[in-house]
Amino acid sequence: MATGTSKAKPSKVNSDFQEPGLVTPLGTLLRPLNSEAGKVLPGWGTTVLMAVFILLFAAFLLIILEIYNSSLILDDVSMSWETLAKVS
């Protein structure tokens, strides 16, 4: 049963100590991007644009899958090891 009488001494953490880090040109260049962290705009923002790109990427993957599965037949596109090995 916990009684709150621990023999462990609490470690004293110096809150004033902060490691300075390394300042690099790339870090200086990317600093404005990090200044916007945590700020959320009201509304949908760019969610609609992101959804459009996700749908386009899904359609691209579906087309690739159909070509690979030979569900989508294209002229001069065949999926066999022999045609992949031919040097044109």
Curated annotation (Swiss-Prot):
Q: Could you describe the post-translational modifications of this protein?
A: Phosphorylation is a light-dependent reaction catalyzed by a membrane-bound kinase. In vitro phosphorylation is incomplete.
Domain of life, source organism: Eukaryota
What did gene disruption experiments reveal? Loss of photosynthetic growth, cells grow normally on a reduced carbon source. While all other PSII subunits are synthesized and are inserted into thylakoids, they do not accumulate.
Q: Which residues carry this modification: Phosphothreonine?
A: T3
Q: Which SUPFAM superfamilies match?
A: Photosystem II 10 kDa phosphoprotein PsbH
What keywords were assigned to this record?
Chloroplast, Membrane, Phosphoprotein, Photosynthesis, Photosystem II, Plastid, Thylakoid, Transmembrane, Transmembrane helix
Molecular function terms from GO: phosphate ion binding
Q: Which Pfam families match?
A: PsbH
InterPro entries cross-referenced by the UniProt entry: PSII_PsbH, PSII_PsbH_sf
Q: What is its main location?
A: plastid
Q: Could you list the residue ranges that cross the membrane?
A: 48-68
Which sequence ranges form a coiled-coil region, renumbered to this chain? Answer: none
Q: Where is it located?
A: Plastid, Chloroplast thylakoid membrane
Q: Name one GO biological process term.
A: protein stabilization
**Record carries keyword Transferase:** no
GO CC, sorted alphabetically, is: chloroplast thylakoid membrane; photosystem II
Q: How is this protein induced?
A: A monocistronic transcript that is strongly expressed.
Record membrane topology: Single-pass membrane protein
As for family, the record states:
Belongs to the PsbH family.
Q: How does it assemble?
A: PSII is composed of 1 copy each of membrane proteins PsbA, PsbB, PsbC, PsbD, PsbE, PsbF, PsbH, PsbI, PsbJ, PsbK, PsbL, PsbM, PsbT, PsbX, PsbY, PsbZ, Psb30/Ycf12, at least 3 peripheral proteins of the oxygen-evolving complex and a large number of cofactors. It forms dimeric complexes.
The entry's function note states: One of the components of the core complex of photosystem II (PSII), required for its stability and/or assembly, possibly playing a role in dimerization. PSII is a light-driven water:plastoquinone oxidoreductase that uses light energy to abstract electrons from H(2)O, generating O(2) and a proton gradient subsequently used for ATP formation. It consists of a core antenna complex that captures photons, and an electron transfer chain that converts photonic excitation into a charge separation.
Q: What is this protein called?
A: Photosystem II reaction center protein H
Question: What organism, scientifically named, is this protein from?
Answer: Chlamydomonas reinhardtii (Chlamydomonas smithii)
